[in-house]
Amino acid sequence: MPEPVLAITQIHGIAGRRDELRALMRDTETATAAEEGRRLYRFTVTLDDPDEYVHVQEWASEETWKAHQRSRAFNDYQRSLFDLLARPSEMAIHRGARTTRPAPSGPPDPRSLD
């Protein structure tokens, strides 16, 4: 059975190019939506800095992740990043680790927060 691939990237945008970078991220999310093996492909902004992002991708297998790396969507994204980043991104790739997804807990009882 193929093992999943999880890639997490820290992206460092330039404040003056924020709108362009966010538009590129949105377009890339849309462009990858139909790729085989794509389980999750999401860009998020950090809480403390509106120009720092986290990109999380989950792929069904090494093969589907590699296919994405060769895709037009990935290549278009990479080419468009050139003038939008303050410094190079940092990526961590996790392969085949067991994943546990706990059942969601209910909303907290507001009385317990006192």
Language-model features: where?
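Short, flexible segments with low predicted structural confidence
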Residues: E3-V5, E20, E36-R38
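Short, well-ordered beta-strand segments in beta-rich or mixed alpha/beta enzyme
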Residues: V5-H12, R42-Q69
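An amphipathic, aromatic/His-enriched active-site/gating alpha helix that lines ligand/cofactor pockets
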Residues: D27-R39, E58-A92
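Short, surface-exposed ligand-recognition loops at beta-strand->loop->(often short) alpha-helix junctions
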Residues: H12-L21
